[in-house]
């Protein structure tokens, strides 16, 4: 018997689209123009200015910087380390994340939703906190200090996998839970062993999602800043950290400009591959059968009274090991170590948060820095959600003309650029551009929120966009046929779906802003630093008290971030964003 709901959806009227009214054209033009103006003023202008200072030092084009930079052996070493950490971080994240996607999205077991929520926590943690957590774990005297991994390249790769594991789990798992299991079951019934059924049936169907996740993870790994700086220092520098070194320590804008261009090439290639993979994934999802057919399997399901070790036990064991050993251990150790001072259990580290540290290491107390971070993050979140929602509304449209579709695709890719361009480049570019003329923001309280919003906008877009693209276009057509104006269609059809995605978008934007370090380290005024900046200063100062305060401050920042995401998770609808 046909499902009545499905029947009603199928019978929605399909009419020819009329030409949009001038008011609708003006409205959509404004919706696209405001974000483009924001991106042009607060991203393109600062970045291009910094690059221009390097290539046009005396007003004339000078490309000799490329020869100077690429003739230095250090540059090739940095490029090799950048690509190596990107490739290795991506490979391990995918290898460990695919079993996690199966367990958390295709199997049922008590506490599954709790584990799903927990694996999301590392991704939203500030990178400085992640670096401190792994450093505390691997330092001499730490639980894993005997391994001798403190300050090594494997430690950086492990921290990157910790940070990006959830990207693979959520992206692949979101598609896996919608796959119809019957083709794999048919292969099994024909005698194929579990591994063969998976590699010949399920894995090809998951390839678009895996490729999309891998492209994003590579982007995050190759452009990591806080994690590399805390764990590797300058010994294992990357292009990202080298841009910071050249701008802050040597003021060599030409070298920084060349490295920024190199990074833009890497980022552009990653974004192009990610966009292609994402399109394939969306087309694949459109071809899936009724989601009701994709019934979650009971973990360790019995077949003929015996466990299926190849199908259930192996991925369950890998996932349990990752969750406990890779995700939980650094966080638990950070929490435990924050209560140790002078070799005894104590609250001294937390009490010291009300001071400026040993030898006045800070200009404000940690609690004052926390208040600064919260206030700035609220402002940045409002800006990012406003701009990101406008972008998502425009990009979610499905025009009939090919030029319009290409323009929308270009707009989508354009607003992904802040994800990969060095936050250091953006921050230093702010100092060069927003200090004169009509946009003189020197000393303004809005400059840091704007810089953080630039970084958070792509996250908002990628969170809200899947929700809007899930809307059946026939719903909009039906509303228009019934006489609704374009504005009313947007309010009554898109509005309810948009509200479902805004909760998670608010949480992600707030978490990203709260933990942003690269641009903020340039722009935060000495009398009003943010919490990540304060933590980095504390771990760079000698003294056990300062280090203990850094641990306690990291716990505070992690707890605030996790709390915000927990509240955002309660506000979201049943459909999650891409990450």
Where are these regions (language model features)?
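Transmembrane alpha-helical segments of polytopic membrane transport and secretion proteins
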Residues: 1-34, 274-321, 399-406, 568-579
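Membrane-water interface segments at the C-terminal ends of transmembrane alpha-helices
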Residues: 25-59, 71-177, 205-226, 230-232, ...
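A short amphipathic helical element positioned immediately N-terminal to and/or at the very start
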Residues: 62-70, 346-360
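Polytopic alpha-helical membrane proteins, predominantly small-molecule transporters/carriers
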Residues: 79, 191-193, 200, 370, ...
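Short helix-to-coil transition segments within interhelical loops
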Residues: 107, 177-206, 249, 355, ...
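Glycine-rich helix-loop "coupling/hinge" segments at transmembrane-helix boundaries
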Residues: 226-251, 341-345, 517-547, 577
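A donor-sugar binding/catalytic signature common to diverse glycosyltransferases
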Residues: 471-475
């Amino acid at each position: 018997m046909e499902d009545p709901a499905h029947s009603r959806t199928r019978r929605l009227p399909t009419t020819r689209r009329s030409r949009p009214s001038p008011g609708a054209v003006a409205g959509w033009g404004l919706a696209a123009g405001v974000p483009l103006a924001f991106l042009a003023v607060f991203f393109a202008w600062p970045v291009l200015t910094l690059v221009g200072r390097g290539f046009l030092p005396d007003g004339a084009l000078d490309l000799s910087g490329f020869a100077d930079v690429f003739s230095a052996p250090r540059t090739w070493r940095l490029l090799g380390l950048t690509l190596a950490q990107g490739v290795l971080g991506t490979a391990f994240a995918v290898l460990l994340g695919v079993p996690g996607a199966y367990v958390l999205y295709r199997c049922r077991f008590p506490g599954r939703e709790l584990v799903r929520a927990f694996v999301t926590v590392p991704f939203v943690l500030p990178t400085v906190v992640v670096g401190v957590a792994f450093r505390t774990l691997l330092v001499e005297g730490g639980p894993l200090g005997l391994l001798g991994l403190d300050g090594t390249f494997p430690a950086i790769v492990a921290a990157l996998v910790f940070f990006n594991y959830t990207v693979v789990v959520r992206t692949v798992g979101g598609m896996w839970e919608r796959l119809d299991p019957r083709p794999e079951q048919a292969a099994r019934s024909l005698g194929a062993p579990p591994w063969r059924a998976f590699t010949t049936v399920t894995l090809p169907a998951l390839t678009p999602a895996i490729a999309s996740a891998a492209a994003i993870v590579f982007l995050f790994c190759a452009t990591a800043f806080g994690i590399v700086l805390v764990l590797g220092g300058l010994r294992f520098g990357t292009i990202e950290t080298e841009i910071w070194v050249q701008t802050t320590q040597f003021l060599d804008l030409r070298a920084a400009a060349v490295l920024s261009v190199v990074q833009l090439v890497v980022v552009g290639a990653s974004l192009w591959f990610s966009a292609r993979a994402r399109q394939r994934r969306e087309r694949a999802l459109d071809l899936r059968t009724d989601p009701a057919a994709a019934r979650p399997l009971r973990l360790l399901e019995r077949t003929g009274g015996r466990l299926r070790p190849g199908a259930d036990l192996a991925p369950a064991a890998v996932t349990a090991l990752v969750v406990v050993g890779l995700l939980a251990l650094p966080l638990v150790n950070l929490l435990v170590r924050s209560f140790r001072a002078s070799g005894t259990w104590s609250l001294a580290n937390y009490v010291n948060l009300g001071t400026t540290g040993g030898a006045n290491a800070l200009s404000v107390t940690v609690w004052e820095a926390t208040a600064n971070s919260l206030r700035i993050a609220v402002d940045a979140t409002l800006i990012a959600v406003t701009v990101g929602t406008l972008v998502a509304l425009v990009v979610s449209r499905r025009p009939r003309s090919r030029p319009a579709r290409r323009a929308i695709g270009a707009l989508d890719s354009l607003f992904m650029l802040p994800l990969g361009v060095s936050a250091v480049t953006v921050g230093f570019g702010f100092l060069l551009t927003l200090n004169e003329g009509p946009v003189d923001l020197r000393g303004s309280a809005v400059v840091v929120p704007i810089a953080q919003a630039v970084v958070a906008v792509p996250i908002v877009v990628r969170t809200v966009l899947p929700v809007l693209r899930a809307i059946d276009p026939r719903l909009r057509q039906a509303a228009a046929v019934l006489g609704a104006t374009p504005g009313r269609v947007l309010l009554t059809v898109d509005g309810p779906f948009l509200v479902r995605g805004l909760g998670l978008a608010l949480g992600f934007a707030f978490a990203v802003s709260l933990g942003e370090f690269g641009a903020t380290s340039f722009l935060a005024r000495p009398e009003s630093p943010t919490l990540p900046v304060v933590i980095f200063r504390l771990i760079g100062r000698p003294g056990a008290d300062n280090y203990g305060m850094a641990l306690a401050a990291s716990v505070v920042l992690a707890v605030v971030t996790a709390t915000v995401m927990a509240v955002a998770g309660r506000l979201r609808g049943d459909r999650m964003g891409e990450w």
